[in-house]
Amino acid sequence: MGKQQETILIIGAGISGLATSRLLTNNGIPNIVFEASTPDRSQGFAISLQEFGYSTLLAALGDLPLSSLIRAVAPDRQIGGTGWIDQALRDNRTGELLVAPDLTTTKQTIVRANRNALRHWIADCGEDELDVRYGHKLQSIKGKLGDVTAIFENGAKYKGSLIIAADGVNSTSRSQILPDVVPETIPLIHYHGEFQLSHSAFDELIRPHSGHSNILVGVGDSFNTPLSICNITKTRVHLDWSYSRTVKGENDILYRPNVQSEEAKQIPPALLEELDALNLAEPWKTILNSESLKTHRVFHWTTRCVYITQDDARRAGEQGVIFVGDSWHAMPIFGGEGGNHALLDGVELADAIAASTASSGNGDWDSVIKNYYGGAWKRSQEAVRRSTQRFFLLHRPATEWKEISEQKKKPA
């Protein structure tokens, strides 16, 4: 029982939970990861890893080379790609290049990563296998720091010294401990679609516009239409698209922030009518239309942000819960930094726990919480505000995009 008391319980097997678990395991610190979903649940869309995120993780994993990460997670890894993106913005009604960095002097600092592949790679970066228990949906939390119990809907109960809440923007852990902290809904329409093309169709339709970039970003008049490669196999190219725009008044029929999960998978007729009326350039025109969407998996996404005060973090810590990832700093996906800060959370929290364990032989949990939040709170909460501001800037009117493009063309 004593050994079980010392175990750290991690709720959620996303990238923040797995990164924390992997680093704790590599340091010989017992932990268990609990995941509500089944092992075959896909998180196959891609995210952008920035240098500040992946370099910190690689160092914590024993100074692994960047090439080991790229070979494992880049969406185009099977054809020798590096997850490169051109960071360009194009007018999705003309195809005109609006904004692009000077690629002759810019080294690759952003790595596009397939989320599923990233999770598997993190889990495999060590000699000892991670203890991940699937089918465990958290029901409640009882106890205090140093002696806390997680109770699951399947009837299982586990005691531990600390619960690490890595269960996302709609965190059950957070709602149990901090019920007054409610995610803030961003007033934006956001639909996400997944589809596949043969290599030949991809080379004909998208490659002439994207080149070797893993993202083709189209911006319009207060709306965006990015196309992203999720994964390339020997025969198929798996892609996704997003359509996002600002809300048009109080009665916008497509603004459904409280839509239920099953209804979120249904395509509203108003969306099809709206896409058909956009007058898009290729390749968006061929992909984003009412006929093409019949073969796509389409989801309504509600964009939410989470802010937690330092006092919130302290109160949760007293009850034995500490946060990583979207559970305490959810931010917009497009233009956001969430995945990178999730990795930093895992590294910094594991470091704090390992340092405390090394000095005392057992965790000084009050010091762990103080040391972790001492740096992570300001870093992550500033990132939420920064990402939210950037998200709205990426949905600016077409006239502003044109002005920016003209300014970029002027000689320095």
Curated annotation (Swiss-Prot):
Keyword Nucleotide-binding: no
Signal peptide stretch: 1-21
Keyword terms of this UniProt record: FAD, Flavoprotein, Glycoprotein, Monooxygenase, Oxidoreductase, Signal
Glycan-carrying positions: N92, N170, N231
Species of provenance: Trichophyton tonsurans (strain CBS 112818)
Family: Belongs to the paxM FAD-dependent monooxygenase family.
Protein name: FAD-dependent monooxygenase nscC
Enzymatic class: oxidoreductase
Gene this protein is translated from: nscC
GO molecular function, one term: monooxygenase activity
Pathway stated in the Swiss-Prot or TrEMBL entry: Secondary metabolite biosynthesis
Cofactor(s) it depends on: FAD
EC numbers: 1.-.-.-
Purpose of the protein: FAD-dependent monooxygenase; part of the gene cluster that mediates the biosynthesis of neosartoricin B, a prenylated anthracenone that probably exhibits T-cell antiproliferative activity, suggestive of a physiological role as an immunosuppressive agent. The non-reducing polyketide synthase nscA probably synthesizes and cyclizes the decaketide backbone. The hydrolase nscB then mediates the product release through hydrolysis followed by spontaneous decarboxylation. The prenyltransferase nscD catalyzes the addition of the dimethylallyl group to the aromatic C5.
Domain of life: Eukaryota
UniProt keyword Signal present: yes
Positions with a binding annotation for FAD: E35, A46, R119, D326, G339
